[in-house]
Amino acid sequence: QSVEVIQSDRIGAALAAARKFGSVVVLKGHYSVIASPTGQVFINPTGNSGMATAGAGDVLSGMIGGLMAQGLPPFDAAVAGVYLHGKAGDLAANRPELAGAQASLVATDILAHIPFALASLQAGDVSYLEERLLQSVSSL
């Protein structure tokens, strides 16, 4: 399918790919979509345009793989990984020295902010919407 077709129905495209390949699919972008072959869908509320940078996807795949290695099921690991990755990117982009210049983010900025993203989640620093969406994650 073309980029235009996928972007016109991101949820449908992610679900179709998940069902076709029998795998959890992460469709990165503004409000990344995670879909499972059984029809579960999560739309991620975290992240920013500065994260469209070389190496950011490598950081994300490492996070998801690490969560799976700790025993989380693939869908939960993808949801938690994408959420924390986006939260780390948001924290990195909001540093005072960047003065809102998200375009200057590099993958190591995201990597460096993962512990802070995890700490903020563990401290309950989430909005009501994020709390509701995170209920699909069984544990961290």
Model-based region annotation:
Residues 41-55:
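Short pre-catalytic strand/loop immediately N-terminal to key active-site residues, enriched for Gly-Thr
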Residues 89-140:
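Charged C-terminal helix
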Residues 31, 49, 56-60, 64, ...:
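Gly/Ser/Thr-rich beta-alpha loop segments that engage phosphate groups in nucleotides
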